[in-house]
């Protein structure tokens, strides 16, 4: 039987930051889903992508329609996935996470099939690869057909997302301190509203700048480690709670990292 959480443990947990991270184009250097579509899908996938980019459809409908256009065997997909490079700073980031003891979750509009294979190659095990620290869509390969399903969609979602990142983040961050989000693409644009500290690159960086969302640019996970440490150190140096610098600051959220 699991022991009850004490008040002191709850207080400590509220002070501890929680980190959420995208996968495709963030942990990997390329968007794996886009690579699959480029290589093996009927060209009509680009028209579907445009519908999603302009907001006409959500990512669930987008991915469902796009993956139905893929013609590839499991062996072909695996070979493509195995060739996708991982961010060179990611191993250091994982070591830093282990040393710091901070909770870390991958929230992705990509596919568990892909993510688990890449993480295995990167030497990642445990909850991040096999357990409840990974939230993504499901992909089944049947002959040359790829069938997508969406276990992390939500009835609360207003945007038709395949993986509703804001709902997941709100649920998991209730008893934690500052919320950190790391991402690169348009599928992250709704997630940043739930973060106190945003690290962004590529399309997400452009979106944040256009929308006036406070963020810190990054290139690799070496930058991510340094930026998060800087954010936490500056928070600790303040008196009492530290004002959040990300989107949640505009809602008056107050956080503490002491």
Q: In which residue ranges do the predicted regions lie?
A:
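Alpha-helical substrate-recognition element adjacent to the catalytic core
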Residues: 2-123, 131-138
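C-terminal cap/substrate-recognition subdomain and adjoining C-terminal extension
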Residues: 2, 89-103, 110-258
